[in-house]
Amino acid sequence: YDCTLSFEGHINNSDVSYNLSKTNDILLSGFNLIGNPFAHDIYKGEGAAIDNDDLAEGYYILSNSGAWSAKISDGTAIKPCQSILVKTVKAGELKIKKTNSSPSRKSRDNESLEIKVSNSNYEDVAYVSFDNKVGLEKIEHKNVNVPMIYIPVEDKDFAIAMLEESTKDIPVSFEAKTMGEYTLSVSALNDRFDNIYLVDKLTGDFANMLLE
């Protein structure tokens, strides 16, 4: 099916502001859906169009498979007309600057881990960053068949968890939504880890994920 889309109006040539809401005392408060209002790519992160001030690290995009896929604030472009789901720590105005500059400080500058689970149809990912920023809480996928992997910390589940540098043990939770075989993989985003061991709490088996 081919079609031609036309947009009427004026191209934004200056900064654009959104009002972000946050309702206290409800589950997963502070999530807001915002879009790229410009005709060029933008980025989220320090020094980029969407700064991390008052926002949790990273954001979500809705994939074609119906998964809310977490993205860390790095060199991943937000395309024109693309929407992302961000979490704010307080209600207020968010200014999106008219710039296509990439973040001045990227996730790979820190010690970070990417933990991925996949089957033959879907995949999900969680991140661990040893930093003092605000983590991104895990949300349910639109597609109930997509598996979920997340990091539980202090009674909350995170897609992007922020932990102390001294942390040695990281809890990882996984939910298989359908029967089948799943693959779990771990990647060090900056190659600063010599060994990363996955311990099966049920069997006691462990494996060095950097060698598997």
Stretches with model-predicted labels:
Residues 2-212:
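Compositionally biased Ser/Thr/Gly- and acidic/asparagine-rich
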